[in-house]
Amino acid sequence: MDKNIIIGAMTALITPFKNGKVDEQSYARLIKRQIENGIDAVVPVGTTGESATLTHEEHRTCIEIAVETCKGTKVKVLAGAGSNATHEAVGLAKFAKEHGADGILSVAPYYNKPTQQGLYEHYKAIAQSVDIPVLLYNVPGRTGCEISTDTIIKLFRDCENIYGVKEASGNIDKCVDLLAHEPRMMLISGEDAINYPILSNGGKGVISVTSNLLPDMISALTHFALDENYKEAKKINDELYNINKILFCESNPIPIKTAMYIAGLIESLEFRLPLCPPSKENFAKIEEVMKKYKIKGF
């Protein structure tokens, strides 16, 4: 298997709601907008997609919509398929594979605090259950669980279809250490604030929140960096500084959904509790920053 298969500029899709349900028409339109603006892959039902509060039926529907919308294009679908119960993660991975996803993104098990051996066995079971690429997802700030460098490398070497890791720990030193010990690994940035540092230190892509709003800029940044044109990549990164900062003024995906609503890209500013709309103060701050960016709605 080609372990390079899903890299480049990828978008962690939001999940739009309308009257308490997934707004399927808006979801498909959002994905089409990504396709039209140079994104290499979309990532449905991850953290940004509020996967934790979707029903299993909604989770499956979002994957099906993403696959159907991307059919016949060059854009790949890297489907969220994580759980803190291994059997459930395996089931989600199998569903994604059977319904046409090109690969899966699997978050580290949260809440139950597994050992490194437990993490290894968890991911090995997932990898053995499907024959599509698997990207590990390390985000200890949300899961309370850190996948160690040694465990990531062991999984990469032992499991043919585990091709890399989405790193959202904010730890650049860890990223550099990973590539120093296993340069074949595909390191993917999971934080917009450090996309450029990761790409300029050997990273092979990003899974971006900001690209929901500005897919063309994230695509350009990523591809300039992958082509080793770091001057142009840095220029775009600097232009994105203010929007990247404001899009994390509250818990993701609250600010990005708010920005999408302000831009007219989604019809309703709805969340699933316990997430809720931003404070009036932060809404105004998001609106102010967005005036600097030319963003068109539907």
Curated annotation (Swiss-Prot):
User: According to the UniProt record, what class of enzyme is this?
Assistant: lyase
User: What is the source species?
Assistant: Campylobacter jejuni subsp. jejuni serotype O:6 (strain 81116 / NCTC 11828)
Q: Which keywords annotate this record?
A: Amino-acid biosynthesis, Cytoplasm, Diaminopimelate biosynthesis, Lyase, Lysine biosynthesis, Schiff base
The pathway to which it is assigned is: Amino-acid biosynthesis; L-lysine biosynthesis via DAP pathway; (S)-tetrahydrodipicolinate from L-aspartate: step 3/4
* Catalytic activity of the protein: L-aspartate 4-semialdehyde + pyruvate = (2S,4S)-4-hydroxy-2,3,4,5-tetrahydrodipicolinate + H2O + H(+)
Q: In chain numbering, where does the site feature Part of a proton relay during catalysis fall?
A: T47, Y111
A GO biological process held by the record: diaminopimelate biosynthetic process
Q: What is this protein called?
A: 4-hydroxy-tetrahydrodipicolinate synthase
Q: Quote the Pfam families the UniProt record gives.
A: DHDPS (PF00701)
The record's annotation in SMART domains points to:
DHDPS
